[in-house]
A protein has these predicted regions:
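Conserved core of the sugar-phosphate nucleotidyltransferase
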Residues: 1-6, 11-17, 26-120
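Hydrophobic helical membrane-anchoring modules
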Residues: 115-149
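Helix-loop-strand module that forms the ligand-binding subsite of alpha/beta enzymes
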Residues: 23
Length: 149
């Protein structure tokens, strides 16, 4: 928000679409960014578009002293591969959102579109020495550079 406000105040520049990229999420593709922008350009009713990783696991949250299964509307007990996926939000990899959303103090608006992606490196999000070590191993041993995979 600070950068958007600064551009408006100091450069009299207002962008229709703001792209958010988290520096700790290294292994994104250029198409992730392009796809998020393209979705907003083609769908003016949308507030935000971001990449999300489909997952077929069961998720639970603690509610007081008990645990509640999330997405309880998805049948339980079927093989994971046959289940309707949930989507893990990956806005750090690629998010495009509208100016008004950012100015309201949020990254995501109410009306969002998720671009599904599967990337074996998406779990790498640098927040510890171990995360940095994993990233360095991928770069040195697999010759995969940040923002290219």
């Amino acid at each position: 928000k600070h950068a958007v406000e600064w551009l408006k105040k100091n450069e009299n520049y207002i962008s229709d679409i703001i792209v958010y990229l988290q520096v700790t999420s290294l292994f994104r593709t250029k198409s992730m960014i392009d796809d998020c922008i393209e979705v907003l350009l083609n769908n003016p009713e949308l507030d935000s578009a971001f990449v999300g990783c489909p997952v077929h696991k069961n998720y639970w949250k603690k509610d007081g002293e008990k645990f509640i299964r999330l997405a309880s509307d998805i049948p339980y007990g079927h093989p994971r591969q046959l289940k309707e996926p949930l989507y893990r939000e990956e806005t750090g990899l690629a998010l495009a959102t509208r100016f008004d959303v950012v100015m309201s103090g949020r990254r995501l608006g109410e009306n969002c579109y998720i671009i599904p992606f599967v990337n074996e490196l998406s779990f790498i999000d640098i927040h510890s020495e171990f995360d940095l070590w994993i990233s360095e191993k991928v770069i040195s041993e697999k010759s995969i550079l940040p923002n290219e995979k």
